[in-house]
Amino acid sequence: MKILISIPRKVNFLLKNISYIVFLSSVSFLLCYSLGKCNLGIYEGTYGIGLCQVSPSLLPAAASSPPYVVAIDPGHGGTDTGALAIVKEFEVIDKTAARLYELLEDDPDFIPVMTRTDSDPESAQRATVANNAGASLLISIHANSDSHKSSKGFECFAQPPGRTYHQDSYRFAQLIVAQMSAAGHHIRGDEQKTGIKYAYYYGNDKKIVDSSDSQVRSRKSFGILEKTNCPRVLVEQCFITNYSDVERWATDDGYNQAAQLYYAAIKEYFKEF
């Protein structure tokens, strides 16, 4: 059976339990041949949006023109609550991510995708959601914690040196830090206070280095930074163990402001794209 489907340029879609593929542009067609239990062959026009379950071998390339798919990765959720301190990490993440999603959804240049909803998939599964959607950029949102209540401020993790998307990842991280710094957030880091770090795992031990350390290492970084096929940055929005950070960045006003700053950095990233 041959089916011709016309689909609008920008759609909202939910990725839950099954993976979908998104072909981006303005007007075109998606032609599916269905035999038995959803065995599909896919043919897509030069310009078009369609949704269809497909094999990983047919995943789309990231868009080189708007609308861009931006993956928002809530770093914790479901039964994975993250750190529990003055506030709960997953609540900071969830509310900030939801506000960022709304900002991107209202902008015709972007199609936002959440890598998780109310479940707790592993980082590899969340990366697959972003990859299947053809994400051009990913931001993974977290909140920090420390046994020392004086620890405060913003930092983020770029894809480490030597990786495919390191330079673009670092550029995106710089744009985020610039937004946070302009908003008055304390920027963490070495004497240069870049706010950008790299993470490496040596067995169960994690090593954090500042971005001034440009040594190429083969050790794996955070899972979401390793498995996503686009530039990506993991942000630590604030310390939920520090009262001043919580008051500024872990309230409704704080979630709104952080989302606005991430959105501004995303806009700037693609402006330079």
Question: Predicted segments — roles?
Answer:
Residues G82-K95:
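Glycine- and acidic-residue-enriched helix-capping/strand-helix junction motifs
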Residues M1-K2:
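N-terminal targeting leaders characterized by basic, low-complexity, disordered sequences
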